[in-house]
Amino acid sequence: MAVDAADRREVIVKIDGENGNNNGVSGETVGKIWRDGSYDFWTDGEGNLNKGHNAAAVDSDRSAATTGEQQKDEGFEFRRGEDPPTKLIGQFLHKQQASGEICLDMDLGMDELQSRGLTPVSESPRVSTKRDPVGRRDSRSNTNNNDDGEVVKCSGNNAPIQRSSSTLLKMRTRSRLSDPPTPQLPPQTADMKSGRIPKSGQMKSGFFGKSPKTQGEEEEDDPFAAEDLPEEYRKDKLSLWIVLEWLSLILIIAGFVCTLAIPSLRKKKLWELQLWKWESMVLVLICGRLVSSWIVKIVVFFIERNFLLRKRVLYFVYGVRKAVQNCLWLGLVLLAWHFLFDEKVAKAANTKALRVVTKIFVCLLVGFLLWLVKTLLVKVLASSFHMSTYFDRIQESLFTQYVIETLSGPPLIEIQKNEEEEERISVEVKKFQNPGGVEIQSGAQKSPMKTGKSPFLSHVLSNGGGGGGENKGITIDSLHKLNPKNVSAWKMKRLMNIIRNGSLTTLDEQLQDPSLDDDKGNQIRSEFEAKLAARKIFHNVAKPGSKFIYANDIMRFLPDDEALKTLSLFEGASETNRISKSSLKNWVVNAFRERRALALTLNDTKTAVNRLHKMVNIVVGIIILVIWLIILGITSTKFLVVMSSQVVVVAFIFGNMCKIVFESIIYLFVIHPFDVGDRCEIDGVQMVVEEMNILTTVFLRFDNQKVVYPNSLLWTKSIGNYYRSPDMGDGIEFSIHITTPAEKIILIKQRITSYIEGKKDHWYPAPMIVFKDMESLNSVRIAVWPTHRMNHQDMGEKWARRSQLVEEIAKICRELDIEYRLYPLDINVRNLPTSTALPVSDRLPPNWSAPASGSN
């Protein structure tokens, strides 16, 4: 059959449940079938299409010449013979046709099913079914009589690629401060019962990592004695290089002793230098690094004995000990080289070679010294910056984490008191049961414990599983003792790792398999999950049927001092001594937001410090290279002139960039006006900090538009930070008529004040209400200036509270019959001018007809 290559038509697959007759395919269109995917239509063994209740018929477009001709039923297929996935899909289609179902899911990401060179028609990867009674485009005639059949439009597998690209685009443009998609609520959430505790098994959680101490063991008062030093520094690592150094030390010392003991070897000279001096030089060169490590360990040992030095200096000593070790080693080599080679030997030997070797040793020593100073400065500046900026926020966040997990678990304090009471009663019973009146010492007698402490409360805050070294957890008692003055650099680094790598979790009262480490179900990863956690905590802590959580309820879970501190964290709880559901929900949601923003801030700060470290490495490397050239004498006057001219050109090109980089670094690490998640106001526009970099800062505007500001530009602008502001005020203004009675005005003030003082968790008492201004001698503007018990970081909550206050003011005005009215105005008519004095016009609109001359 002749095939027209230029004729590209469309094939429509129709599923007809009533008519099993199949129309043939025109010979002119067999050679060029337009399709959008790789489909395998089920045929029988002879190539004909299967006929049944749901037979697939192919209705192709025909040209005007083929009018009314019906060809024989011929089956056709476009099949990939060697394609197993396509074959499986064909079998699946056949089974669905046999069962009467039409439900195809082509959301497969297989490369074998990609139709190359064809563009997808629909973005949806699923097969859609709809009726198409009308002819498709390019259809000149349609000979199929079954136009009411269902048309299955099969889209190819390029659609998943297009959808995945759009998904990646959404992931790339999604804000880091936004929540993941909110899941649907479970049909029934099992609330926790506070009165039960499992009899056995292990309760695991995401941030109670390591096992607590034994119940009888008391914690040390000094939390810095052992846990400040990471595990990697407590044990010496035995490497191959150290083994070779020890073997070389033993062999060289043995050779050195033999040389000095044997007279012939002692007098032997090599290159006008005695043999034992050469051996000493080799000993210092090979084993000097080992000796320098001993010196460093001795210094570290004496520093560890001093409490103040251990907290402040030891971190930096361990941080630069490799550089110090290398400097000591090269210093020993340079001293040995200088004193072993005297002037006679230098004259007898090649003087130029000795000088070059000496200069090389000096260059290496200077390079290591500069690198040591650079490393020490970067570590000191980074540590002091983190301590002064983030310590308070980290401590508060970890305490919040501890409170959330403790309140979501069993009531440990109540359980401990019940056990102590049962133990006391059992002792009394045994005392009365003893006929002689002699007290029997029993192993079950209560062991002495510190007041206010609980063996259950030796909680360990961790980043999800404990571990050693920098990931080791920290006890809550140690956290309370920390402050910016006594916290060590290692402790600060560990706290930062807990925040960066951990997350808020809840401790569900359920038994978990100790062999499983699946705590992700209890992690709070969105505001929706934070609200669910707040609901669980409320049902776990509050008494059955109660609408509030009282101080006594919290004291069942926490010691008295921690319970009072926890109570002060909630809005209005300090005055009422109770916590409502809304305040608990807001507190947990705000705790999640704060934890997320703090983790992002620490991540951005770490990235900025690492990039700054790389920049400093480049600068110090260039300085070391220039110093080496000067020491080695490679530079000459001509070379310096050429280099100076190049430096001038580079300074002209990159001078402004260097200035911008320097200003950005000072702005980010010294001024530091904001952190990630802070709501700021720049040029009258409120924005939230999305990301901090060395050169730029990314903000999110109120409509979620990302705005990138260069830090050098922010240097010149005034920035208002809502997050760092104290509790902020607000203002509401309204106008009343000047004739409003004074009694009503006094009543308005009293009712507004009573409403604000009744909302103790939202407003401070005694708002200021003043007559602000007078308008047109007929109205008075009254201003109400209350003060929120929050700053305006959460702008949505601020407007919600203000809206409630405005609604209350409107309600008060309506109840007091104070409404907006236009009072009558006095109009004095003195004298009306005569009609002759008024201007008279004979002009009429164009569609009006002029009156007759005789009409009045």
Swiss-Prot record:
A family per Pfam: MS_channel_2nd
Gene Ontology cellular component terms for the protein in this record: plant-type vacuole; plasma membrane; plasmodesma
GO biological process, one term: monoatomic ion transmembrane transport
Topological type in the membrane: Multi-pass membrane protein
Spans annotated as Disordered: 45-86, 116-226
Compositional bias ranges of the Polar residues kind: 155-168
Domain of life: Eukaryota
Localization, UniProt: Membrane
Keyword field: Ion channel, Ion transport, Membrane, Phosphoprotein, Transmembrane, Transmembrane helix, Transport
Gene coding for it: MSL6
Lineage, broadest ranks: Eukaryota, Viridiplantae, Streptophyta, Embryophyta, Tracheophyta
Record family assignment: Belongs to the MscS (TC 1.A.23) family.
PANTHER family registered for this protein in UniProt: EF-HAND DOMAIN-CONTAINING PROTEIN, MECHANOSENSITIVE ION CHANNEL PROTEIN 5
Record's protein name: Mechanosensitive ion channel protein 6
Bias (Acidic residues) ranges: 217-226
Positions where Phosphoserine occurs in the chain: 211, 462
TM region positions: 242-262, 283-303, 323-343, 360-380, 615-635, 651-671
Record's compositionally biased regions (Basic and acidic residues): 70-85, 129-140
InterPro entries: LSM_dom_sf, MscS-like_plants/fungi, MscS_beta-dom_sf, MscS_channel_2nd
Purpose: Mechanosensitive channel that opens in response to stretch forces in the membrane lipid bilayer.
